[in-house]
Amino acid sequence: MKASMFLALTGLALLFVVCYASESEEKEFSNELLSSVLAVDDNSKGEERECLGFGKGCNPSNDQCCKSSNLVCSRKHRWCKYEIGK
């Protein structure tokens, strides 16, 4: 009886340790994944500073719309729009 109780408690303790270790790895993985996503988001913010995206307010005399996306600053509406026909 004492031996079976000892084995049962030892088994529960071992199960607790294994579950705790796997949970820690999952939390670490999710934190690492979140950090990498935020790092990518920070990099894209740097690109946004260089040029303005679609629908952003702009100044026609100082066109800062993204030329790589075929965007130009509309003189009439003063926002970045797609240039059609080029």
Curated annotation (Swiss-Prot):
Cellular compartments annotated: Secreted
Annotated effect of mutating residue 76 to A: Important reduction in activity, without change of toxin conformation
Signal peptide location: 1-21
Keywords tagged on the record: Amidation, Disulfide bond, Ion channel impairing toxin, Knottin, Neurotoxin, Presynaptic neurotoxin, Secreted, Signal, Toxin, Voltage-gated sodium channel impairing toxin
Pfam families: Toxin_12
Molecular-function annotations in GO: ion channel inhibitor activity; sodium channel regulator activity; toxin activity
Any one of the GO CC terms: host cell presynaptic membrane
Propeptide, residue positions: 22-49
Residue pairs linked by disulfide bridges in the UniProt entry: 51-66, 58-73, 65-80
Free-text tissue specificity from the UniProt record: Expressed by the venom gland.
Marked site (Interacts with channel) residue numbers: 76, 78
Sites bearing Isoleucine amide, chain numbering: 84
SUPFAM superfamilies according to UniProt: omega toxin-like
Mutation effect (residue 61 to A): No important change in activity
Family: Belongs to the neurotoxin 10 (Hwtx-1) family. 22 (Htx-4) subfamily.
Other noteworthy facts: Several genes are coding for Mu-theraphotoxin-Hhn1b for which the structure by NMR has been determined. The cross-references to PDB can be found in entry AC D2Y232.
Quaternary assembly: Monomer.
Notes on the domains: The presence of a 'disulfide through disulfide knot' structurally defines this protein as a knottin.
The protein's role, per its UniProt record: Neurotoxin. Selectively blocks neuronal tetrodotoxin-sensitive voltage-gated sodium channels (Nav) with an IC(50) of 44.6 nM. Does not affect tetrodotoxin-resistant voltage-gated sodium channels or calcium channels.
Record's protein name: Mu-theraphotoxin-Hhn1b 3
